[in-house]
Amino acid sequence: KEIILGFLKEGIKSMVFFEGRHDAHLETILELPRGWGIAYFEKTDIRKAKEVLKDHTCIMGGVPISLIVSGTPEKIDTYVKELLEDVKPGGGYILTTSVGIAPRETPLENIRALANAVEKYGKY
């Protein structure tokens, strides 16, 4: 918290990667000033994060990398559509995978399906 506040005092916003599950601790993020930066969640329920943090904090994540690696393009499309219907209203959401890089064995058609679904459903 002290580091984030120090950066913010200098006009620098932060992006914090919350590794693991933080569902039980989301309220502690509300101790930071509104608009402090971006909370990138790995395994935290992104819908719960949006419900708790609302317009206080921009949230990021929500797409399990396992879906991109082993799902089908149809499953990816449906997942993204439903996720965005739930968390897009009000803004403050960046859709991305729960980890930054897809493994080498990720099917290219699944990466395309993710990009296409974002184009189709993700515009504000």
Locate each region found by the language model:
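Active-site loop segments of alpha/beta catalytic cores
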Residues: 1-124
